[in-house]
């Protein structure tokens, strides 16, 4: 049996990935595997710019709406799910198209996973209790002592990642920075061609981000977050689902911690920061094909042709 193949289409948020993926689907018999950690959640449609029902009816999409916002999803599970799906799609005589911008997942897929321990509910509860008693700053200072390298790259208010770094240290006796620095041996079980949309005009990308955020508001984003609060009372601002860009800012607005103009400003700024981080990852990622979606009028045609050549179609 021939080795399965997958074509990855990467890029920053609001960079045109979805539109291009649908163009490819008009030409080739593809199925889309979402590379987006926010799209896995049900009930989070507007703020994640989730593909519409008509778009999902036009071409099969995978790894969308697979868990509730109170459940968790991981890079390890993505690697497992994506690898399985590439094989299944290939067995149907169709082509796997991996589309998105969650670069941590893509790195895990292509470079392997570090040997980090699973989350420990008892230890996490103990850390949460310490945070309630002494404050997040206490946990951050503790992390600075046991793992200064990780503490240096985390923001002092990043509760989830500070807690996870301390959890790893207490479970293994080694700082997370040591684990992440350990080499991993990894071989993909399928052939992969990696293409990326990298816009050089940052102002144009920022404009797209602002326009899309305002469109989300018009579509009822605040109502969507209010519905999440009603359906899932256990959700908090620190829940992984609510840490998705835009949702954290909307949550704070609904908590009365900010006014509406400040919420909008913070939401747009956070989305721009996400795009900046994605572009930083992309520039460090080995790529087979790169195009600028804003300045290259033939980017769509060139990527479709690259996909055809790769799949032998």
From Swiss-Prot:
Keyword line: ATP-binding, Magnesium, Nucleotide-binding, Transferase, tRNA processing
Binding sites annotated in the UniProt record for substrate: 13-18
GO-annotated biological processes: tRNA modification
UniProt: ATP binding residues: 11-18
Positions of the record's site feature: Interaction with substrate tRNA: 102, 124
Family per similarity comment: Belongs to the IPP transferase family.
Name under which the protein is recorded: tRNA dimethylallyltransferase
